[in-house]
Amino acid sequence: MVRSDIIRGHLDSIILRLILEKDRYGYEISQEISNRTNNSFQIKEATLYAVFQRLEKKEVIEAYYGDVSDGGKRKYYRITSLGKAYLSELVKEWAEVKEIIDLFMEGLE
């Protein structure tokens, strides 16, 4: 398992990326994270909903209730245009961080 404190600072990026692909509800996002990481990282429900609240407050995502015919009245999240710009900034920031870390970690495998 990956230490959650390493990933924690990048949860906004991960969640925004998943919502960029398509509108999603909370459980779907947590399952997608687990699946894509082969269960090496699992997000706790409380953490996930805290991120949703923070992102909604920043107006980078918005919530709406899905149609009952889609399997119940689930709360879905979609990315806003502000969210797309924010995600773009986060991607650039990650590239810079990765470059710095790589400078110190190269050749240590």
UniProtKB/Swiss-Prot annotation:
Sections of the chain in a coiled coil: none
SUPFAM superfamilies: Winged helix' DNA-binding domain (SSF46785)
Pfam families: PadR
Annotated S-S bridges: none
InterPro entries: Metal_resp_DNA-bind_regulator, Tscrpt_reg_PadR_N, WH-like_DNA-bd_sf, WH_DNA-bd_sf
Name the record gives this protein: Uncharacterized protein X
Gene: X
